[in-house]
Amino acid sequence: MKLFGFGSRRGQTAQGSIDHVYTGSGYRIRDSELQKIHRAAVKGDAAEVERCLARRSGDLDALDKQHRTALHLACTSGHVQVVTLLVNRKCQIDVCDKENRTPLIQAVHCQEEACAVILLEHGANPNLKDIYGNTALHYAVYSESTSLAEKLLSHGAHIEALDKDNNTPLLFAIICKKEKMVEFLLKKKASSHAVDRLRRSALMLAVYYDSPGIVNILLKQNIDVFAQDMCGRDAEDYAISHHLTKIQQQILEHKKKILKKEKSDVGSSDESAVSIFHELRVDSLPASDDKDLNVATKQCVPEKVSEPLPGSSHEKGNRIVNGQGEGPPAKHPSLKPSTEVEDPAVKGAVQRKNVQTLRAEQALPVASEEEQERHERSEKKQPQVKEGNNTNKSEKIQLSENICDSTSSAAAGRLTQQRKIGKTYPQQFPKKLKEEHDRCTLKQENEEKTNVNMLYKKNREELERKEKQYKKEVEAKQLEPTVQSLEMKSKTARNTPNWDFHNHEEMKGLMDENCILKADIAILRQEICTMKNDNLEKENKYLKDIKIVKETNAALEKYIKLNEEMITETAFRYQQELNDLKAENTRLNAELLKEKESKKRLEADIESYQSRLAAAISKHSESVKTERNLKLALERTRDVSVQVEMSSAISKVKAENEFLTEQLSETQIKFNALKDKFRKTRDSLRKKSLALETVQNDLSQTQQQTQEMKEMYQNAEAKVNNSTGKWNCVEERICHLQRENAWLVQQLDDVHQKEDHKEIVTNIQRGFIESGKKDLVLEEKSKKLMNECDHLKESLFQYEREKTEGVVSIKEDKYFQTSRKTI
């Protein structure tokens, strides 16, 4: 008998409520919680991290207020350079934060594949779990990153790791509807036989979350279709309860394939049973979620009804009474055997049932009157026994209902307790998913309760039907004395010799009625026997159901114990957190008291400052008044002094004005004289410029003459040189002649020649001296002209300077005149 079931929540998926945090999200970073190295790691500044480590090597594994290291923050932000720097410095790779997450889990969680690969290559442990029981592989499954999952598995990640809900990565991929991850994990030989805490298989979860693609993948993997959960439901039951006809059709086709394979191994006798099973299974799909009551026997044992044979009615009646029908046993047309077989493991159950019914038909004891009387005595006792059995059964059903109610109420209480604490199932993908999970479990428990109520109603209907059958038995027993009285009448009528034709007809009618009544009695007895057999079978079935209920109860008790242990663990953890919070609260209260005292002190200071400020304000107002008075007095004195100064200044200005007017007249006279001088100097300058031009012309002519004289002088020097050479030759000749001729004659000739030559030389020298004198004269003239030119330039410069001074003096005169006019 099934006590629990899941409701018809159709395809509730975790995917809708998961799209929140992992867009990631990472950490909530507050600047006040971080140290310098943590800030540098968040920004990805590897140089700053290196400087922090150079200053203080202890900052390598330093924790912030959330127990996070720089490696955690770098992996969350995806800064590969910082991660490589920290890993090369041999930091702690498997250090955990406040949620017991390692840097590897954080890198996989934030989908930072490069950081995760670096950590795995440096020996990070991929099998560590956070406080929610999730490993890095669970987070890779959630983010649907096959490359990350493959790297985790290649570095030794456990493919069958369990979270706190006993979900393996494969089951978690099915819950999140990650079809690619399911295919990937199955290729990596993940176990398709894994079950969660409620003993639900992968196929059941795929059906529950309405994933036909995943169902098809699992069926291709030859998953066990007949596996049952804690409540005895299989995958097809989930499809029926959620009204998923497509998935149900897939599962039925897969079952047919399995049964076809088994048909080849089983004989021809089993083939008929299997076909009956499939016809009944398809035709009579259960309306509720109760699978254990699907094996509901609606069969009745065929009754023996003797067909009337040719002969006397008396013989017919005796034969019917003795139960010796000569014809073949005829089954009641309205009572046909119908059996619903649910579990394919119970193959051939239909045949065994048919054999049992045939044996029951053959073993009906209706042989003699003694046997009938013995049977009647047992039947008289039977209603009481039946009523006792019915009461026991109803008590058992009521007990099972109470157990179910208590378990469901206990589960609901536990869930409300957990909600009061703040968490239900603490798997964070994210909190909304857990809330959905809790709502799902509560709804499932409510539906289980409704299923138990439906089961109880069905059992009550069966009991009412049995009561009606017992009433029929009582009516049959009430008819037996009338039949016996009729038989006695017929015997007496036979014994009396004086009976007439009318009595004979009456007896004949009575015999016919007697035969009919006996036939009815035989039918009723057969029904009673069949009901007894049915009741025995049902008792056995109910005993089995009670055993199943006990087993489920034991399993539920274990589950409750596990939940209680988990609750105690969570309560202990929450107690520790509460103690920490209390300590922090006391610390904060102490700080608050200190702040209050400081606030009081500050208030007293503020009051004193306010009094001082009021005094200062009054003083300030008085000082302002005095300052105004002083300003007024100062302004008055200033006005007086200004008036005095103005009067003195005006007198001075007047005197200066008179003096300036005198100077102006003098300057005008000087200006006129300068004008005359300017005109005269201009005329003289013109004359001098003309003389300068003539001098320049003369100078150029003299220069030409000097050049010509130089050329002539050079020619004369050349001639003198030639003459001196000739003279030397002449002297040599004279000497030679003197030697040859007479010294005296030669001497006279030589003297005459010398005198002639001397005159020529003296003439040349005189000419040269005269030309030199002329050159000197010309140079003196040029010097004089240059001096005159310089003098003229100086006079021009003085004239221009005097001119500018005169312009300035004119402007000053104009200014003084304008100032006089204004005054």
Curated annotation (Swiss-Prot):
Gene Ontology cellular component terms for the protein in this record: plasma membrane
Coiled-coil regions listed: 431-480, 565-724, 776-805
Keywords of this entry: ANK repeat, Coiled coil, Repeat
Start-end of each ANK repeat: 66-95, 99-128, 132-161, 165-194, 198-227
The organism's place on the tree of life at top rank: Eukaryota
InterPro entries: Ankyrin_repeat_domain, Ankyrin_rpt, Ankyrin_rpt-contain_sf, CC144C-like_CC_dom
Chain spans, region Disordered: 301-343, 355-402
Chain intervals with Basic and acidic residues compositional bias: 372-384
PROSITE patterns (UniProt xref): ANK_REP_REGION (PS50297), ANK_REPEAT (PS50088)
The protein, known as: Ankyrin repeat domain-containing protein 20A1
